[in-house]
A protein has these predicted regions:
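Class I S-adenosyl-L-methionine-dependent methyltransferase module
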Residues: 45, 49-190
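General small-molecule cofactor/ligand-binding pocket signal
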Residues: 193-195
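Short, well-ordered alpha-helix to beta-strand connector turns
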Residues: 25-26, 48, 190-191, 206-207, ...
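Conserved proline-anchored active-site loop of SAM-dependent methyltransferases
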Residues: 18-21, 28-42, 53-58, 64, ...
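Conserved binding-pocket/active-site segment within a compact domain
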Residues: 165-177, 202-203, 214-223
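Short loop/helix-cap segments at secondary-structure boundaries that form the rim of catalytic
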Residues: 45, 202-206, 252-259
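S-adenosyl-L-methionine
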Residues: 1-27, 37-38
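Long, positively charged, glycine-interspersed low-complexity recognition regions
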Residues: 217-218, 224-327
């Protein structure tokens, strides 16, 4: 199962394994929940009485609320093709659930900021969508005829034609729909709360298991905001001194006194470079012995290598977008 919304930097494929590696507790806190993969896995696990997800990104919290708590707010059957102008307007307005939905189904790499297609793809994708979704048969036929004329006129290569079959917007929308269906039918009684706010303003006292998945050092940050790594390390030290049970997903040790307790290797398919193994690590604010004494740790039964994750190449800028930034 893939957890969470389509979102840059998501832990969607390894979310269950991360939650399995956490101790059980009363109140679980994900301090920068992003696409909600960890909060969804934690809620479904039944290991906690309450799960709370914080994120500074208003639009992603709004979308998580609509798909994991307040169901029935999204019309999945009549979602239109979105132009670049409409995407930019929704991104800049950032007020309604439809604005939030457009940002994360119609953006490159689901980053919420950059339009999904370059100019040369937009006309084809729009015509393909119209050939399926327009209300009357005559309109659909005309869109299909226009699409075929464009193909003949522009003489696309086989690779370009194959690329057109990737239905990015529909795939993202379907993924969001699956999240809502899963959460709507869940059997766990765990209470889920989602809050828009900074991790530095969280009242940590009531939480007994705390998890951070910050932007990784050396990668592009999210939501066009610079992340304060120095302040973050100080926060980790404060929580550790308070005796809190704290975990951090990172590539390297996030702060002094944090110990690597698990690692997860996933194969990432980079269009220009082939498969690249990426190792993500889980750090605990204490020793390995202290970690092993925690209650509620699950046995990890899944294989160490994850299913391949496709990361797209942005032919507009000649950059490759990974799950943690542009390289």
């Amino acid at each position: 199962m893939v957890y969470g919304l389509p979102y840059k930097g998501s832990k969607n494929i390894i979310a269950k394994r991360i939650v399995d590696a956490l101790p059980s507790g009363t109140n679980f806190l994900d301090c920068c929940c992003g696409g909600g993969a960890i909060v969804q896995a934690a809620t479904l696990s039944g290991k906690f009485n309450t799960v709370t997800g914080y994120d500074i990104n208003k639009s992603i919290i709004g979308l998580l609320q609509a798909t994991m708590v307040d169901f029935g707010k999204i019309d999945y059957e009549n979602f239109p093709v979105v132009s670049k102008e409409e995407f930019c307007a929704a991104r800049d307005r950032n007020e309604t659930i439809n604005d939030f939905l457009i940002q994360y189904t119609c953006s490159f790499g689901n980053n919420g900021t950059t339009y999904l297609w370059g100019e040369h793809k937009t006309k084809y994708k729009t015509l393909m969508h119209n050939a399926i979704a327009l209300p009357t048969m005559d309109q659909r036929r005309q869109a299909l005829r226009d699409f075929m004329r464009c193909l003949v006129k522009d003489r696309l290569s086989n690779a370009e034609l194959e690329n057109l079959t990737v239905l990015d917007q529909a795939t993202s929308l379907n993924r969001i729909h699956k999240v809502e269906n899963t959460m709507r039918s869940r059997k766990s009684k765990t209470k889920l709360d989602l809050v828009c706010g900074s991790m530095f303003d969280i009242p940590f006292e009531k939480y007994d298991v705390i998890y951070f998945d910050p932007p990784y050092v050396g990668t592009s940050c999210y939501n066009k905001k610079n992340f304060d790594f120095i302040r973050f390390r100080k926060l980790l030290q404060v929580l550790k001194d308070m005796g809190k049970t704290v975990f951090v997903s990172e590539y390297n040790q996030p702060a002094e006194g944090f110990t690597e307790v698990k690692s997860f290797v996933k194969m990432m398919l980079m269009n220009s470079k082939g498969n690249i193994p990426v190792q993500e690590k889980l750090f605990y604010g204490g020793s390995k012995e202290q970690y092993n004494s925690l209650e509620g740790l699950s046995t990890l039964s899944e294989p160490d290598i994850d299913t391949t994750v496709l990361d797209d190449t942005d032919e507009r800028a000649g950059e490759v977008e990974t799950d943690r930034g542009v390289v």
